[in-house]
UniProtKB/Swiss-Prot annotation:
Its EC number is 2.1.1.-. GO terms for molecular function: protein-lysine N-methyltransferase activity. It catalyses: L-lysyl-[protein] + 3 S-adenosyl-L-methionine = N(6),N(6),N(6)-trimethyl-L-lysyl-[protein] + 3 S-adenosyl-L-homocysteine + 3 H(+). The keyword Cytoplasm applies. Coiled coil: none annotated. This is Ribosomal protein L11 methyltransferase. The gene is prmA. InterPro entries: Ribosomal_L11_MeTrfase_PrmA, Ribosomal_PrmA_MeTrfase, SAM-dependent_MTases_sf. Belongs to the methyltransferase superfamily. PrmA family. Keywords: Cytoplasm, Methyltransferase, S-adenosyl-L-methionine, Transferase. It is an enzyme of class 2 (transferase). GO terms for biological process: methylation. It is found in: Cytoplasm.
Amino acid sequence: MPWIQLIIDTKAKYAEQVGDMLSANGAQAVTFVDAKDTPMYEPKPGEVMLWPETQVMGLYEADYDMDGVVARMSKSKVLGADFPHKLDQLEDKDWEREWMDNFHPMRFGQRLWICPSWRDVPDPSAVNVMLDPGLAFGTGTHPTTALCLRWLDALELSDKLVVDFGCGSGILGIAAIKLGAKRVVGIDIDPQALLSSQTNADRNHIGDKIELYLPEHQPELKADVVLANILAGPLRDLREVITAYCKSGGKLVLSGILAEQAQGINDLYSQDFHMEPIEIDGEWARVSGKRK
């Protein structure tokens, strides 16, 4: 069955109201996207992430009375009588299949591949992590995850103990084990992330080598390698905690950092680490070093 999409450009402060109006007027789904390719900075706790110029899209069945929807929405104070909008007809497709077709195995560095479960492994002799793309946690498609994966691929990890702060999907910890680490301790504030990490570790047959904790239960230990792909704010706030996990001579990698934030994070951690050159990928950055 074909669909019609009603697209409305609005300001961030009105976006949720517009989305609610679309839902109240029969939209089967409502999506928020960036209208002007604007970088997204860190939200405050509990804040919804919306762009200054936000495009709100409502999806309707093709035979829905769209003239009626537009007429009703034009009476709202938020939009007004002649609010700018666009109607697009979408052809009927197997959207799930099309989504799956867009994802292919990805190579990071010399040895490491991240492969969706429905794709053949390109190189059976390589280090292959099986991980399906998702929305909530990392799968290698974001530059910050890619920066960390390339860093791990270049590291000698045999028999190393690794700590992964903000483990999310477990992708970095699983990659570390596949690259030779003997044990990974993953820490995340979200119980769902810990479940995702364990599920993905089990899928890669290394579930017995990863330990997962909420912050209030995290163990005290000294690791050979510490990973933290989170955000600049938590990296600042948790500097002492993250640093304490890294033994003398141990390695540290930090990401989730915008390029303009990288030097500040680098300087902060240089108190305890010999810092390496900052690596930039588009708008994002990686900071790394060796514990003094």
